[in-house]
Amino acid sequence: MKNKLLFMMLTILGAPGIATATNYDLARSEYNFAVNELSKSSFNQAAIIGQVGTDNSARVRQEGSKLLSVISQEGGNNRAKVDQAGNYNFAYIEQTGNANDASISQSAYGNSAAIIQKGSGNKANITQYGTQKTAVVVQKQSHMAIRVTQR
């Protein structure tokens, strides 16, 4: 487990601007955790991914400065994707349950977005093109879908 975690951390740190975590583990459920902090030329980008369960996947792409992304997944078959560009943007995805799908896309300056999914089969998408926008989506049931676009 320690060698697997070390290899994963070195792989993630070697890819500037991209963090990916998956837990396609055939053994019992474990807690997977990845942190990628990119401080090259004061970019100060950080991606934090925590996973418990099976077949969860998380992907983060950051291009800009002062960017923070946090993804927490518990359950199975959850998918999370964060795409950040610009400056001072914050994205948070929390998934508890199974087969949830969440994505956040941010550009420009000073945006905050959060998706919280507690249930199964939910889909949520937040897209922020403007400056200093805030969006929060909470899905507490199953099979719900929402798309938020802020310009």
UniProtKB/Swiss-Prot annotation:
Signal peptide stretch: 1-21
Biological process terms in GO annotation: cell adhesion
InterPro entries on file: Curlin_rpt
Highest taxon in the source lineage: Bacteria
Subcellular localization: Fimbrium
Matches recorded under Pfam families: Curlin_rpt
Keywords recorded for this protein, A-Z: Fimbrium, Signal
GO cellular component: pilus
Induction of its expression: Constitutively expressed in agar-grown cells (at protein level), part of the csgBAC (agfBAC) operon.
Record bears the keyword Signal: yes
Functional summary from the UniProt entry: Curlin is the structural subunit of the curli. Curli are coiled surface structures that assemble preferentially at growth temperatures below 37 degrees Celsius. Curli can bind to fibronectin. The minor subunit is the nucleation component of curlin monomers.
Sequence similarity: Belongs to the CsgA/CsgB family.
Name this polypeptide is given: Minor curlin subunit
Natural source organism: Salmonella enteritidis
